[in-house]
Amino acid sequence: MAFLLHQARFYTTVNHLRDLPPTVQPEIAFAGRSNAGKSTAINVLCNQKRLAFASKTPGRTQHINYFSVGPAAEPVANLVDLPGYGYAEVPGAAKAHWEMLLSSYLATRSQLCGLILMMDSRRPLTDLDRRMIEWFAPTGKPIHTLLTKCDKLTRQESINALRNTQKGLDAYRDQGVKGKLTVQLFSALKRTGLDEAHELIESWLRPSVADAEGAPVAQ
């Protein structure tokens, strides 16, 4: 079958939780540090050049961007591009706004069926990456990590990054986290890991898509 993600288009932008769309379709959120390559990864996954825009000033994008997936008349899911985090020059008020927006969305959005977490393969599992995991993990829903820009690593460095990140994620299971925590190497430039990421994301959506039509509208 054709990749579901290739049928993605811009839907809406929100800056406050009260403005989140009252949709019933399942959602997959994409999160990551500024400069982790999140926008580029979304574009490659969706086979489009300019679906997700990267701000010229890292860390300045403060909105949640929604992209609908599936037929335009009857979309079956939404991809949710969350604001990048961790850029040092962002004002404190903006950081506080992002923290509230991200933590509340991840913890309470009932339509959310999984989180794709982008980490630069050269610097995985930063303190802020761990904070994202800790906000979302209590929901019991899966988190899949893309170790981006792996083309910048040697083969052995890639192996080490993958092993060490998986070890770090396994520690959360030892602490009682119930949701699946998985990781893979990914390069938008070389298209490394693209098929693996497609298959995993669509596996999250398929059972949810089957149930979405009869689900109640959630705020």
UniProtKB/Swiss-Prot annotation:
Cofactor: Mg(2+)
Lineage start: Bacteria, Pseudomonadati, Pseudomonadota, Betaproteobacteria, Burkholderiales
Binding site for Mg(2+): S39, T61
Protein name: Probable GTP-binding protein EngB
Stored HAMAP family: GTPase_EngB (MF_00321)
Taxonomy, superkingdom: Bacteria
Signal peptide location: none
Organism listed in the record: Burkholderia vietnamiensis (strain G4 / LMG 22486)
UniProt GO MF annotations: GTP binding; metal ion binding
UniProt gene name: engB
Gene3D superfamilies documented for this protein: P-loop containing nucleotide triphosphate hydrolases (3.40.50.300)
Family to which this protein belongs: Belongs to the TRAFAC class TrmE-Era-EngA-EngB-Septin-like GTPase superfamily. EngB GTPase family.
Task performed by this protein: Necessary for normal cell division and for the maintenance of normal septation.
Record InterPro entries: G_ENGB_dom, GTP-bd, GTP-bd_ribosome_bio_YsxC, P-loop_NTPase
Binding site for GTP: 32-39, 59-63, 81-84, 148-151, 186-188
Gene Ontology BP annotations: division septum assembly
Span of domain EngB-type G: 24-207
GO CC term (a single one): cytosol
Keyword vocabulary terms for this entry: Cell cycle, Cell division, GTP-binding, Magnesium, Metal-binding, Nucleotide-binding, Septation
